[in-house]
Amino acid sequence: MSSAASDVYKRQISSWLGDGTLGIMITNTQYKQGFYTAKEAVIISVCFSLVSLPFSTVIADQLGFMHIFVPFYATVCIASLACALIMPRVYPLNKFKDTTYNNVEHLKEDLVPKGANIFNFGLNKAINRASNAPSIKDILVNGFKTVIDMYIGLLPLVMAWGTLALIVAEFTPVFKIISLPVVYILEFLKIPDASQAAPAILVGFTDMFLPSIIVSGSEINTMTQFIVGVLSITQLIYLTETGAVILKADIPLNLKDLFIIFLTRTIIALPIITIIAKFIFA
């Protein structure tokens, strides 16, 4: 299995059970060490991750969907899979090249020799890797330093973005104005209460929880609340979480790229989520 493929699994596991930011930190470390290219790092960072199961239950509970949490989260997985299949083939992800960080050597994994036993080959590779690994103390110290540096550096930014976005969403018409094109898209998809749901869809770029807060506190159609809740998880790029970590990391993505990725994921996922929601609430 290649480093890029194994990192996809590590990233998904860390995201499902912990936090999406942990997956990005793993990706960034592997990228800097030369295990894969800029293109691989970017795709892994913005495609192969889901909001953690615990936080997904928080969103489902906020919207009153805990009784249908399995189809709720299954819809997230289906829409996210569609995004992962399409996103690497469109802008901006298709612009990145197979170059390494600071031109370090690209550490490609060895292929299994013809006729060799896969288990024995993998076991020998694991033993060799373990023999060169740092001590447990070094691993813990380096991991602690990385986490502290990441979260202390991000905490002020996260609080600032979250507070500002909530103020703008609740007390100004900014999101209502910029979401007018989204209203027409929702109406085309025959989603009820389109004018109320549209601002919640765009505000997801700032924080994943704000869309659910906005639609749960109003008399919006239940199916529309389901669509907004699932979409807020599937959008994946939030300035108060994954977006901030990506911008702080060495992965070659800027704010413009993140916003385009956010919009692209929304465009891909929205019709899929809507179709599934219409079946669930038929």
Spans of features found by a protein language model:
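C-terminal transmembrane helix pair
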Residues: Q30, G34-M87, M208-A282
